[in-house]
Structures are given as C-alpha cells and as structure tokens.
Amino acid sequence: WGGGIMKAEAAAATAKLLQISLKMKKTTMKDIMEFRNSIEIKMTELAAKRATDEQIEIISGHLEKMKNEEYKLDTFAEFDYNFHKSIADASGNSVFSLMMETMRPMLYNHIIYTLNPTFNPEHSNHYHEKILQTIRDRNPEEAVEAMRLHLAGTERIIEELEGVNVTI
C-alpha cells in the first residue's frame, strides 16, 4: 500500500463498511460485552507496556473531560468512548484502533445504555482512574485487572437492566 493518506482512506472505508454490516445484523449488548472483554483487556495490557508519555496524557485528558463535564450523558459518553479509543491507540496495535473506530456507534450506544438509568459519573470515573494509573505506572498485570473489573461492572449493570438481549 502507498503513503499515509491512502492507508487512512482505506482504513476509513473499511471501518465504514464494517459499521454498515454490523447495523444490518442484530447486535446485542451481550455481543458488545464479549467483544469488549476480548479486546479491551489485551489492548489495556499492551498500552501499559507501550504507551508513550504523550499518549498517556491524551488518555488522561479524556478522563479529565469526563470529570469536569457538567454531567450531560451524551457528552460524557463521547468522552468515555474517547478514553477507551485512546487506550487502543496507545496499545500500539493498529487493528485494535481500527476495530474501536469501527465499533464507535455501537460502543457509544452501549455506553449510553449502561449509564442512562443510574448516571453516576463518579462510579465510572473510579474505574477509569484506576485504569489510567496502571497504564501510567507501566504495570500490565494491574492494567489487565483494572480493565477486567471495569468491564465486569458494566456487565453487571447490563444484567441488572435485563438488557443482555437488547439490540443496538
């Protein structure tokens, strides 16, 4: 493949095609959680090993936006998605970044669904702070555990809402 522009255009086109395909299927909350559990834990481990100081500051910046937001659900969800996407970028694995970008609309809706009934930014931020700290400390084992706990908490919310089979 050619230069950076061609690669970026190809990645964007691939992401768009996958987004369209996913919209045509009945994707459930359970599907999204299985996806998240399979890639976000590994990408967080890799981010703890590979993230540059600049990438860590980007992750931190998204968390600060979540903490300083006036607690509007839609903007908080966007910052939440950006937090997770920046971890994918910091993993150094371009496939993780592409998959997170591809899943953006579904992940955004997933975040909205899980936050909407009990919107408690402090609870969510607690998990995010721990994840960021483990990446900053360059501790992959603790990063894995922090993300695992975060996703387990999200999964519990979905089960409490009886939303496992809800399609997005």
Question: Where in the sequence are the language-model features?
Answer:
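Glycine-centered secondary-structure boundary/capping sites
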Residues: 26, 73, 159-160
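Short linear motifs at protein or domain termini
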Residues: 1-35, 45, 164-168
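Generic C-terminal helix-cap and adjacent flexible tail
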Residues: 141, 156-168
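Solvent-exposed loop and edge beta-strand segments that line ligand/cofactor-binding
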Residues: 116, 120
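Conserved amphipathic alpha-helical segments that form helical-bundle/coiled-coil interaction surfaces
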Residues: 32-113, 123-134, 142-156
